[in-house]
């Protein structure tokens, strides 16, 4: 993966195209789809409120469920791009490890602004709680992961934004994974796309860091070596706040050799950087009975 370091780390369509062009041949060689995928299951009335369930050949016991929320700058992206590994690779990765994979898509800005993303994550998790047993999954062992804008939506969900019942919304959730997210939404930290999604929402409402510090669900944060500087600053802010509140550092992975796009795109072909520590986190927090929040 050394070639990723030669790419301009700025988050642009060119970075996405170049990253996927480099990594897709590796996925095509090893395969990037689970044995069975049930597509476009609806968890709401909007056309974008859809999810795919990725399963294997089945096991004797209900399996943990790992959910992935894609990025796209709040205004783009999808759970599945036909003919590419996006993002069936995540479902395949989960299934190879004996879990159920779920990839979801959600409503986009500017038509749907904050906290629509968090509300969609909550609705998708509610659907999973109510339906995943039919696919061999354990509704009490759900881990929710998001990348970039997806991480922001997952962070909002974990912080209780957009719901009248934050604790109930997290029922069955055993862990949250925040891959290169933004947690401090002070005006100085907002770019054009953040303004499209958040509008004039005050920082004290939009920022998730205070809620994450109080969250009872185990959390894993990541930042990529070649993430732009603002993502490193966000990760440093999480570490400082966590140390001040809890007297220790949070679970955090520095994803060596990867950029903002390749962190998730590497799953299944470069396990050392993210796959192994991510799997270890999931295993640790789904290994026991009743591990989900308020199980």
Language-model segment annotations:
Residues 232, 236, 243-295:
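C-terminal catalytic histidine-bearing segment of alpha/beta-hydrolase fold enzymes
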Residues 82-90, 102-140:
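Catalytic nucleophile-loop/oxyanion-hole region of alpha/beta-hydrolase
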Residues 5-61:
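N-terminal cap/lid segment of alpha/beta-hydrolase-fold proteins
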Residues 184-185, 226-230:
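Acidic catalytic loop of the alpha/beta-hydrolase fold
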Residues 123-192, 204:
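Primarily recognizes the serine-hydrolase "nucleophile elbow" in alpha/beta-hydrolase
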Residues 50, 57-93:
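Short, surface-exposed "cap/lid" segments of acyl-processing enzymes
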Residues 215, 221-223:
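Short beta-strand/loop motif that positions the catalytic acidic residue
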Residues 25-30, 181-211, 217:
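Mobile cap/lid helix-loop segments that gate and shape the active-site cleft of serine hydrolases
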């Amino acid at each position: 993966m050394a070639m990723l370091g030669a790419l301009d780390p700025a988050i642009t369509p060119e970075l996405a195209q170049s990253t996927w062009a480099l990594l897709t041949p590796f996925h095509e060689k090893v395969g990037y789809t689970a044995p069975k995928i049930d597509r476009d299951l609806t968890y709401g009335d909007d056309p974008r409120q859809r999810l795919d369930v990725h399963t294997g050949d089945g096991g004797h016991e209900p399996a943990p469920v790992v959910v992935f929320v894609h990025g796209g700058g709040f205004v783009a992206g999808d759970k599945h791009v036909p003919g590419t590994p996006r993002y069936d690779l995540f479902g395949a990765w989960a299934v190879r490890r004996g879990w159920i994979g779920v990839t979801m898509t959600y409503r986009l800005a500017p038509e749907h602004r904050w906290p629509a993303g968090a509300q969609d994550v909550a609705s998708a998790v509610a659907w999973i709680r109510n339906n995943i047993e039919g696919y061999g999954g354990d509704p009490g062992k759900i881990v929710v992961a998001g990348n970039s804008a997806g991480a922001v939506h997952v962070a909002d969900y974990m912080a209780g934004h957009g719901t009248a019942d934050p604790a109930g919304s997290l029922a069955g959730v055993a862990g949250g994974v925040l891959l290169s997210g933004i947690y401090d939404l002070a005006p100085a930290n907002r770019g054009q796309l953040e303004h499209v999604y958040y509008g004039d929402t005050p920082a004290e409402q939009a920022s998730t860091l205070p809620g994450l510090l109080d969250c009872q669900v185990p959390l894993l944060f990541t930042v990529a070596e070649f993430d732009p500087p603002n993502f490193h600053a966000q990760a440093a802010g999480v570490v400082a706040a966590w140390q001040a509140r809890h007297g220790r550092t949070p679970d955090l992975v520095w994803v060596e050799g990867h950029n903002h796009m390749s962190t998730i795109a590497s799953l299944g072909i470069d396990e050392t950087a993210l796959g192994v520590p991510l799997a270890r986190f999931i295993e640790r927090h789904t290994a026991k009975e009743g591990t989900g929040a308020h199980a």
